[in-house]
């Protein structure tokens, strides 16, 4: 068994909640703004025994991991929670909160089990800081993508 690490990051997006929720809900597009995520594929609901199932591939620093994740709670325009089903043990949530007409807060919390093979090579505190920084950069790229798309919609 490995060590569990938790990371929390927050950003404020200068766009309405609807736009922010819509962009995040397109799980297959997450690799556009999550640099360590190589791909996310939605599993065909007709062939899967579990609802809301996705297959994730993470590739970073010479390591590659795959896992399936299931959305365990979906509150439209408010919250998504998930947990892994096999593969890399992970769980998390993202909470959206309107801060006025054009501002939306996005709070991402990710918890995962650090595999022993990585723990042997990396000190937990160093890895924890690196992952938190990467998640913050990812959520900031998400913010930039939503704001760019929203501004393009507003000017057309």
Please place each PLM-identified region on the residue numbering.
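Hydrophobic ligand-binding cavity/cleft-lining segments
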Residues: 1-49, 152, 156
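Short loop segments at secondary-structure junctions
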Residues: 14-18, 74-75, 99-101
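Hydrophobic/aromatic beta-strand elements that line small-molecule binding cavities or substrate pockets
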Residues: 9-11, 67-73, 91-98, 110
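Amphipathic alpha-helical segments that line or abut small-molecule/effector binding pockets
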Residues: 18-21, 136, 140
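Hydrophobic beta-strand positions in extracellular immunoglobulin-like domains
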Residues: 13, 58, 110-112
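Beta-strand/loop substructures that line and gate deep hydrophobic ligand-binding cavities in soluble
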Residues: 83-137, 153-156
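Glycine-rich portal/gate segments that line the openings of hydrophobic small-molecule binding cavities
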Residues: 41-91, 105, 137-156
